Amino acid sequence: MSFEVFEKLESKVQQAIDTITLLQMEIEELKDKNNTLSQEVQAASGNHESLVRENQQLKEEQHVWQDRLRALLGKMEEV
């Protein structure tokens, strides 16, 4: 009788070990995925900052051209 109990216990311990092993593998995969996503976020953040700067520069250029155009139109009206 005690041998059967021992076998059941051994089986449950083995199942627990297998489950722990699978969970450890899953944790490693998730860590790798997390690292990859972190790198993607950093790259996207850098791209965002670059686009914000470019957008600001383009807005400034647009204002300069608008001012030039207004000045030119003003001169044309004078003539």
Curated annotation (Swiss-Prot):
- Report one GO cellular component: cytoplasm
Q: Which GO terms describe its biological process?
A: division septum assembly; FtsZ-dependent cytokinesis
| UniProt keyword annotation of RNA-binding present | no
**Protein keywords:** Cell cycle, Cell division, Coiled coil, Cytoplasm, Septation
Q: Which Gene3D superfamilies match?
A: 1.20.5.340
The protein's location, in the record's own words, is: Cytoplasm
Q: Which spans of this chain does the record mark as coiled coil?
A: 4-78
Q: Which domain of life is it from?
A: Bacteria
**Which Pfam families does the record associate with it?**
ZapB (PF06005)
Subunit structure comment from the entry = Homodimer. The ends of the coiled-coil dimer bind to each other, forming polymers. Interacts with FtsZ.
Q: Which NCBIfam families match?
A: PRK15422.1
Any idea what job this protein has? Non-essential, abundant cell division factor that is required for proper Z-ring formation. It is recruited early to the divisome by direct interaction with FtsZ, stimulating Z-ring assembly and thereby promoting cell division earlier in the cell cycle. Its recruitment to the Z-ring requires functional FtsA or ZipA.
Q: Which family does it belong to?
A: Belongs to the ZapB family.
**Which protein, by its recorded name, is this?**
Cell division protein ZapB
Q: From which source organism is this entry?
A: Serratia proteamaculans (strain 568)
Q: What is the lineage of its organism?
A: Bacteria, Pseudomonadati, Pseudomonadota, Gammaproteobacteria, Enterobacterales
The gene coding this protein: zapB
